[in-house]
From Swiss-Prot:
Belongs to the FinO family. Keywords: Conjugation, Plasmid, Repressor, RNA-binding, Transcription, Transcription regulation. InterPro entries: Fertility_inhibition_FinO_N, ProQ/FinO, ProQ/FinO_sf. It comes from the Bacteria. Signal peptide: none annotated. It comes from Escherichia coli. Residues 1-22 are annotated as: Disordered. One of the components on the FinOP fertility inhibition complex, which inhibits the expression of traJ gene, which in turn regulates the expression of some 20 transfer genes. The transfer genes are responsible for the process, called conjugal transfer, in which DNA is transmitted from one bacterial host to another. RNA-binding that interacts with the traJ mRNA and its antisense RNA, finP, stabilizing finP against endonucleolytic degradation and facilitating sense-antisense RNA recognition. One of its GO terms (molecular function) is RNA binding. The gene is finO. The keyword Hydrolase does not apply. Pfam families: FinO_N (PF12602), ProQ (PF04352). This is Fertility inhibition protein.
Length: 186
């Protein structure tokens, strides 16, 4: 039997006549910062944003605190309507007579109505400062007492005053809405 010559495997490669050349060290410029540095920068930016947001919210809360917190018009109507239905036309308040607060306070004392002076005052303020009440103040319109009887009519000066007051209240409501939006944002 003849043995066939098998190739011998070696770990060394034969060079093809080239002599190895010595190469210089290659310098690699890394333009991206390391991950820890990126993470640290992101955390610092996030902390700065949060600090700015909390400062803005605190400033908005401070600015919002100067406005009087009155009950809504519906709450004010529901507070006064059971005791003095003559002041209302359905659920809408009528124009109130001048000096009605003193009359209502005397009525509360006489009839022992469970309504504090503070609640009564706030309800009257909420009604008289509402947009629907101020819009109804036109020259010649009637003012009503607690029984629902006409006592006097609106003058031209009162109509002008109501229009100015309405502009002021709308401006304040717009500012309050902007401040509330700042407080509500995340």
């Amino acid at each position: 039997m003849t043995e066939q010559k098998r190739p011998v495997l070696t770990l060394k490669r034969k060079t093809e006549g080239e002599t190895p050349t010595r190469s210089r060290k290659t310098i690699i410029n890394v333009t991206t910062p390391p991950k820890w540095k990126v993470k640290k920068q992101k955390l610092a930016e996030k902390a700065a944003r949060e600090a700015e947001l909390t400062a803005k919210k605190a400033q908005a809360r401070q600015a919002l605190s100067i406005y009087l917190n009155l009950p809504s018009l519906d709450e004010a109507v529901n507070t006064l309507k059971p005791w003095w239905p003559g002041l209302f036309d359905g659920d809408t308040p009528r124009l109130l007579a001048c000096g009605i607060r003193d009359v209502l306070l005397e009525d509360v004392a006489q009839r022992n109505i469970p309504l504090s002076h503070k609640k009564l005052r706030r309800a009257l303020k909420a009604i008289t400062r509402s947009e629907s009440y101020l819009c109804a103040m036109k020259a010649g319109a009637c003012r009503y007492d607690t029984e629902g009887y006409v006592t006097e009519h609106i003058s031209q000066e009162e109509e002008v005053y109501a229009a100015e007051r309405l502009d002021k209240i709308r401006r304040q409501n717009r500012i309050k809405a902007e401040l509330q939006a700042v407080l509500d944002e995340q």
